[in-house]
Amino acid sequence: MQYPTIDATLVAEQDFRISQSFVLRGQAPEGSFLAVLESDGETGYFYALDSSRGQPFQDGCLIWNQESAEDKHYTAKIYWNKDSTKALLTINDFPNAIFDFGRRSGCCRTGYPPQLGPTWSPNGHEWQEAMLADFLPPTPWETLAEKLEELCSIDARFENTDPILIVETCPSAFLG
């Protein structure tokens, strides 16, 4: 799947190789949140930190290990959404992990770890495509989708992507 251009604030970027140790820090433009990509040369983890707390570590996701990734040139980027509550990690412009500080939830392509604790990501770190929405530009259907959502019941599901808008609904919702 090819993703459109990311519509968010780029705060950190680094070229690297899997076998290289490094730390890439991406401070939120506003507030106390920080997203960090750290590699020890064998594994790469993406961390959610909140410097306003006594224990800043909030959550973490495995991004790669040496066995699962080719040791070649990559570019990592950390983005923040408009209200500085969600961080996105891309590698070679492909979304790999997202932290939502408001919902206390994280997801990544590896889905690992299943869960770190009860306060963040209680359902684990499986990839959630919907979490990417805050980092993508508006689709051509944005206004139409908003109007349709107002008209449809809670039984409707919308998939608002470019180039298509999919609306699934239960016919009984319109009969009741």
Language model: regions and residue ranges:
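Long, intrinsically disordered, low-complexity acidic/Ser/Thr/Pro-rich regions
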Residues: 2-23, 152, 163
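Surface-exposed loop/turn elements that mediate protein-protein interactions on large endomembrane-trafficking
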Residues: 3, 46-68, 98-118
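Acidic, proline/glycine-rich low-complexity IDRs
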Residues: 99-176
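Short, well-structured hydrophobic secondary-structure segments
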Residues: 24-71, 77-79
